[in-house]
Amino acid sequence: MAKTLSKPASGALAPWLGISLIVILFDQLSKIAILKTFAYGAQHALTSFFNLVLVYNRGAAFGFLSTASGWQRWAFTALGVGATLVICFLLKRHGHQRLFSVSLALILGGALGNVIDRLVYGHVIDFLDFHLGAWHFPAFNLADSAITIGAVLLIYDELRRVRGSR
């Protein structure tokens, strides 16, 4: 008898999109709070190694291409929209793989959080500033955190899957 693959239920995307929406909600609310509280460039030390700041990132991670002429806003927006389409396809197809899907949902929420910033403000709002003495890690936001956590979980899931197939 031949094995057949059954399609996931039509609602298979719902829980994963729910996670993405929660990420977007927390990301956007945190950015609104920072925008209402801080002037551009202002910083408030919370601990000896952590500040809240308000900076604008017109580029990508770590300010990559932030000094370009403006084309990067639309390029990174298009990249975020493209990633959204690919991730939704993967979630629809592999929604039964929980860790894989949670990983993608976090990445999706983070990507869309930053796409919203680019469309609304023309740049991404960053405000989390970790530092050690005078050395500062580049400021980031909750969307970036979700993308990073999702990427780490994705790598972990893949390593686990590879080890399981041996």
Swiss-Prot record:
Q: InterPro entries this protein is in?
A: Peptidase_A8
One Pfam family from the record: Peptidase_A8
Catalytic activity line of the entry? Release of signal peptides from bacterial membrane prolipoproteins. Hydrolyzes -Xaa-Yaa-Zaa-|-(S,diacylglyceryl)Cys-, in which Xaa is hydrophobic (preferably Leu), and Yaa (Ala or Ser) and Zaa (Gly or Ala) have small, neutral side chains
Give the CC-aspect GO terms. plasma membrane
Q: Cite a single GO BP annotation.
A: proteolysis
Annotated compartments: Cell inner membrane
Any idea which UniProt keywords this protein has?
Answer: Aspartyl protease, Cell inner membrane, Cell membrane, Hydrolase, Membrane, Protease, Transmembrane, Transmembrane helix
List where the protein spans the membrane: 9-29, 45-65, 71-91, 100-120, 135-155
Question: A single Gene Ontology molecular function, please?
Answer: aspartic-type endopeptidase activity
Does the record bear Cell inner membrane in its keywords?
yes
- The enzyme's first-digit EC class, named in words, is hydrolase
Record keyword Transport present: no
Q: What is its EC number?
A: 3.4.23.36
Query: Its membrane topology, per UniProt?
Result: Multi-pass membrane protein
The family classification in the record reads: Belongs to the peptidase A8 family.
PANTHER family xrefs: LIPOPROTEIN SIGNAL PEPTIDASE
| Primary role | This protein specifically catalyzes the removal of signal peptides from prolipoproteins.
Which protein is depicted? Lipoprotein signal peptidase
Instruction: Give the organism the record lists.
Output: Burkholderia cenocepacia (strain ATCC BAA-245 / DSM 16553 / LMG 16656 / NCTC 13227 / J2315 / CF5610)
